[in-house]
Amino acid sequence: TTTMRKSIATVSLSGSLEQKLQAIAAAGFDGVELFENDFLHFPGSARELRQRADDLGLGIDLYQPFRDFEGMPEALFQRSLERAERKFDVMEALGCPLVLCCSNTSPQALDDPARSAAQLRELAERAARRGLKVGYEALAWGRHVNLYGQAWSIVQQADHAHLGLILDSFHTLSLGDDPAGIADIPGDRIFFLQMADAPLLEMSVIQWARHHRNFPGQGQLDVQDFFYHTLRSGYSGNLSLEIFNDVFRETPNRRTAVD
């Protein structure tokens, strides 16, 4: 078995970012997915945050989210590129190599995979100039792209070394999508893996996703099967826990991180 780098999203824990980082380091994780909101409430600069993570032995492995980017009319696309450059500035200061670009949920997004591919290619090209990478993830409630197969098809069309796929067990399994096809994706084109489970609940997928996810094995989704197919692809990057859950946000964070 390969030893995968273990990370956890800062959104998975309660407390200030400083408290979260301490709990994550104490629980033995290698790195974090940094949520922009956590960074915005951090009292110091991006450089100071990078130093703090370094001191705790944590890498900042992923910055997120970058929303509503691809498949946009030209004027909105140009504005989004400006937005991207500001994100890249922050990432450079954080020493963070990868940004998560989630599939567009905006009503202005066009159902045009070729346009989405071309726009993501441009984003990847700009990231590459700074030595950064872009991971594209299908959100279960994306407007035109909500399945990993659709996201992978767009990544293939974009055909850029600095653009890859981000997989999330919740987004795939919550829609009842079959993860078997992940095994056919070249492992090096998968840039990041997020794992979350959830109890089976009757509600909109966005409410379910944002309030009721839990750790792998604590819910009713077949996360093991999903993980198995991802390993079969040859993927050997991060194994990250991204858990949105109201209870965890109110629980002492050391206990959550150790669990």
Segments from the language model and where they lie:
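Active-site acidic/histidine proton-transfer and metal-coordination neighborhood
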Residues: 18, 55, 70-165
